[in-house]
Swiss-Prot record:
The keyword Calcium applies. It holds the Pfam family F_actin_bund_C. The gene is abpB. This is Calcium-regulated actin-bundling protein. Monomer. May contribute to the structure and reorganization of filopodia and pseudopodia accompanying cell movements. InterPro entries: Calcium-reg_actin-bundling, F_actin_bund_C. Keywords: Actin-binding, Calcium. GO terms for molecular function: actin filament binding; calcium ion binding. The keyword Manganese does not apply. GO terms for biological process: actin crosslink formation; actin filament bundle assembly; parallel actin filament bundle assembly. GO terms for cellular component: cortical cytoskeleton; cytoplasm; filamentous actin; filopodium; intranuclear rod; phagocytic vesicle; pseudopodium. It comes from the Eukaryota.
Length: 295
């Protein structure tokens, strides 16, 4: 993310919204916290948002995961010229031009007749169609909270759900709440699964290309490709999935929907419900794609 530039004595957000909100100024400490969250990968930004607003936004979590998150990753891949998912390192923000593309793809998805159930099931998640000129104005004047000329997933989420969310309130709800050790362990276990998926997919792609070569080399690659699902890379992936499932299960039993203040007696209670939901949903997706297939 580009270096955040804040004008002297202007740590607030010069935006307008019904009620208190985007006009409320952020303290220097709150702005620093906000910028730090916005530097995290898209998925971790989403978890921070869901933790803060779980009571209000839990019914929209699936849209945020399967549509919002997938679309912003797709836009980031498009920007970076990456076509294969396993080669993608999750980003944290988009410049305004790619943010326009993100919104364009989001609107296109929601307007597609085959996705009409998303409109009825997740009404407050539906993006507003705007011209490119108007959208860029909105991005500059209303979405870009920290004035860095870029759009993070957190900024998109706060603006999309502005009827109940805003930057100042987000910071108030989220600051001084550490990630619980068991939740961190589960998150890192899922990141290990991602590493194993990448190693597996890279080898699979290499063998697929090599199998197209005529002669002995191509035949050898074809044979290795046929055995890849019983090879060491798949075994390592299976082990990582099992370990992640155990870690997520432990975190879910201990802290599903519970509060955690990191031992700070006067810090208040920070919900972990969003993190627990996200990890379970992510694990479900990984198991569906790479876990043992039912016969």
């Amino acid at each position: 993310m580009a270096e955040t530039k804040v004008a002297p004595n202007l740590t607030g957000i010069e935006q307008t919204k019904a009620g208190q909100s985007f006009t409320e100024k952020l303290s220097a400490e709150a702005m620093e916290f906000f910028c730090n969250v916005a530097k995290l990968p898209f998925s971790q930004q989403a978890v921070h948002f869901l933790n803060a607003y779980w009571a209000e936004v839990s019914k929209e979590a699936e849209f945020i995961y399967s549509v919002g998150w997938e679309t912003i990753k797709y836009a980031d891949m498009h920007c970076k010229g990456i076509q294969l998912v396993f080669k993608y390192d999750e980003g944290n923000d988009l410049d305004f031009d790619i943010a326009l593309y993100f919104y364009e793809q989001l609107c296109k998805f929601c307007e597609d007749p085959k996705n009409k159930n998303y409109a009825t099931t997740y009404p407050i998640s539906q993006p507003q169609m705007l011209t490119a000129l108007k959208r860029k104005q909105e991005l500059r004047e209303k979405v870009d909270v920290n004035f860095d000329g870029r759009v993070s997933f957190l900024e998109y989420l706060l603006y999309q759900y502005k009827d109940f969310a805003n930057p100042a309130d987000f910071c108030t709800r989220s600051m001084n709440h550490d990630e619980h050790p068991e939740i961190k362990k589960a998150r890192l276990a899922l990141e290990e699964v991602n590493k194993r998926i990448r190693a597996y997919e890279e080898e699979k792609a290499r063998l697929t290309e090599e199998s197209k070569i005529p002669g002995v080399k191509g035949l050898g690659a074809t044979n290795m490709l046929a055995q890849i699902d019983s090879g060491p890379l798949k075994e390592q992936l299976n082990f990582a999935l099992i370990s992640a499932e155990a870690a997520v299960r432990t975190a879910s039993k201990k802290y599903g929907g519970a509060a955690y203040s990191g031992g700070a007696g006067d810090a208040g209670a920070g919900s972990s419900a969003g993190a627990i939901w996200w990890m379970n949903r992510d694990l479900e997706e990984k198991k569906k794609r790479y876990g043992p297939q039912k016969k």
